[in-house]
Curated annotation (Swiss-Prot):
Transmembrane segments: none
Region (Leucine-zipper): 212-240
The protein's name in its UniProt record: Chromosome partition protein MukF
GO molecular function, one term: calcium ion binding
Gene3D superfamilies documented for this protein: Chromosome partition protein MukF, middle domain, MukF, C-terminal domain, Winged helix-like DNA-binding domain superfamily/Winged helix DNA-binding domain
GO biological process, alphabetically ordered: cell division; chromosome condensation; chromosome segregation; DNA replication
Subcellular location: Cytoplasm, Nucleoid
Keywords noted in UniProt: Calcium, Cell cycle, Cell division, Chromosome partition, Cytoplasm, DNA condensation
Signal peptide: none
Family according to the record: Belongs to the MukF family.
Record note on quaternary structure: Interacts, and probably forms a ternary complex, with MukE and MukB via its C-terminal region. The complex formation is stimulated by calcium or magnesium. It is required for an interaction between MukE and MukB.
GO CC term (a single one): nucleoid
Organism of this sequence: Haemophilus influenzae (strain ATCC 51907 / DSM 11121 / KW20 / Rd)
Function summary: Involved in chromosome condensation, segregation and cell cycle progression. May participate in facilitating chromosome segregation by condensation DNA from both sides of a centrally located replisome during cell division. Not required for mini-F plasmid partitioning. Probably acts via its interaction with MukB and MukE. Overexpression results in anucleate cells. It has a calcium binding activity.
Amino acid sequence: MIETSQTIPELVSWAKDREFSLNLPTERLVFLLAIAIYNNERLDGEMLEADLVDIFRHTMNAFEQSTDAIATRANNAINELVKQRLLNRFSSEFTEGLAIYRLTPLGVGVSDYYIRQREFSALRLSVQLSIVADEIQRASDSAEEGVENNENEHYWRRNVFAPLKYSVAEIFDSIDLSQRIMDENQQSIKDEIAELLTKDWQAAISSCERLLDETSGNLRELQDTLNAAGDKLQAQLLRIQDCVIGRDDLYFIDQLITDLQSKLDRIISWGQQAIDLWIGYDRHVHKFIRTAIDMDKNRVFSQRLRNSIHHYFDHPWFLWTAQAERLVDLRDEEMVLREDDALGELPEELQYESLSDLHDQIVEHMQGLLIAYRENNRPIDLSLVLKEQLENYPLSRHFDVARIIVDQAVRLGMANDDLSGIYPDWQAINKRGAEVQAHVIDKY
């Protein structure tokens, strides 16, 4: 299995010849996870059979099972894990009865899936992307040096192919796996919300709001982190690809670059799609909550109310009432203005100015900054630009103005500090407490 890719018949034959199989009921899986956690606490990573028996006894207590013949049952469970290549047993004639056990790579992988991979956060993702950026930067520098010095294939494999294959690709796979685990987490949250909505409505609504908001916030935070680094990583990969164009002997690097670009595109694309899907689900739940009482065809709520009133003295309760204010989307770009005739003249402050005109003004200003940047080689401080621009517009337009400026700034260039993985400081941009977090653009 040294080749980078295998055909389906080869993989089927390989697994069949080695008789691979997995059978992990809940009790066995919990036993394996307990072993993994205990193993992480040990410095040597080695366990005695007595340790495994104690762990098995603890897991059986959690399942409230009988402890009769615990040693025999623990021995059977250990033998099953050894047979399925989840544990390795080491023994000799000098250590009879004192076998040493270590988790196999398969055992570590299975336990990691349930333990470590769920520790997915924006901080961890930032660290991973920072490592990837450093590796790709070194690989691209080595590629350019290889072109200048006309290095041989051994140089390219060691300095370019190896870090991309065994560091960058593995981190991409780790991020992809974490996204798939988050998909499962979203599904479990949906099941939890569905269960809440069938129970106590007073507690369910607040719990549903909390679950929806937490998940939406996590998805957006992670996607913002991916978007911030995605374009820069793609640019570095293109640098390496430019170095191997026309080199038939370096086809393996060109193929690897293509695979990495596809993985990165897939990760970023699915992250955005997951957000869109969750937004749709969020709206669906809110719509259901708003209309459920009106659609009470089976009189479920009215029946609950009758029962609550009937048993009030046995189970007293408080009546909570709320009236949500109607929400009006003031920034609907598709909203059609009324064209009714009006008499008189409007004051200058109330004259209508379309969003497209406003957009053109900001674009013209940003283009002027870009020309000055090219001519004088001056960096662009986005916080200062926002602060200066917002002073020229009323507070009601600050959101639209800031959004346009940020959109234009992203197209101008990049900041070298973005590759360091260090978050910039928050900078105030108006007198109402609005702040922005952005590095100085110093590379066009």
